[in-house]
Amino acid sequence: MSLAGKTLFITGASRGIGKAIALRAARDGANVIVAAKTDKPHPRLPGTVHSAVDEIDAAGGTGMACVVDIRFEEQVEEAVGRTAEKFGGIDILVNNASAIFLAGTLDTPMKRFDLMHQVNVRGTYLCSQKCLPHLLSASNAHILNISPPLTMEQQWFAPHVAYTMAKYGMSQCVLGMSAEFKSKQIAVNALWPRTAIATAAVQNLLGGAEAMRCCRKPEIMADAAHWILTQDSSSCTGNFFVDDDVLQTAGITNLDQYAIDPTAELMPDFFL
């Protein structure tokens, strides 16, 4: 199955997992909207919406940069409108953008709490709401949230209550919207990595270069997302997928190809 000719609106696609998903779709010849905040290079976070579009075009897709902060309704409306005007609609939404702050209750400033909920929960809901009118008229429409299974175990709440609440809020969107739009044949699923993924967040927050050795590459999430997004939207919905389980189903058994360092012990991700 291919995403050729499909139009994907991907939030947070200027780097990391979002960009990897974008580039995998581009290899099929998809139209890919890079919806992210980074207009100019950041000293600690490589990549902008413009550099991502250059890579998408080079990979065989058609990219479009949308500088957008998904906390703001007007900005999302404008980005979605521009996308529909240029490409004639939207087939797939990937809610990848996310804010993270790993601290306990007493050490989490309310501005951090607010940011995580505005980006992770409200942003996911808002982007879904604005894209849905276009998805309703699309063929094999999908929404994919990069969020964890709803295990609801105390061990995942205790160290960082606010972050867990915000990520589970994204997953609750899957739980509700998959049922709400099943009759309309819009698939709504979640995808989460089994292990830590080599992104700027891991490098900056979880231990630098040593932590990166224990990660898998973002391409494992991209390949898993590609499989999900090419499934029949009328039946493949309401799932909380884990990347390596998806690849096993897809017949990909060599997971060493995704390791940053195949000799290093992999770092498990949160929530699993």
Regions found by a protein language model. Give the residues of each.
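Short-chain dehydrogenase/reductase
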Residues: 2-87, 101, 111
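Active-site loop of short-chain dehydrogenase/reductase
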Residues: 6, 61-62, 89-90, 135-149, ...
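Conserved Rossmann-fold SDR core element
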Residues: 25, 89, 171-174, 181-193, ...
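Substrate-binding pocket helix/loop in short-chain dehydrogenase/reductase
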Residues: 104-105, 109-114
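A short, exposed helix-loop element centered on a Lys and neighboring polar residues
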Residues: 128-129, 175
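Catalytic loop of short-chain dehydrogenase/reductase
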Residues: 136, 142-183, 192-197
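C-terminal helical subdomain
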Residues: 190-191, 208-272
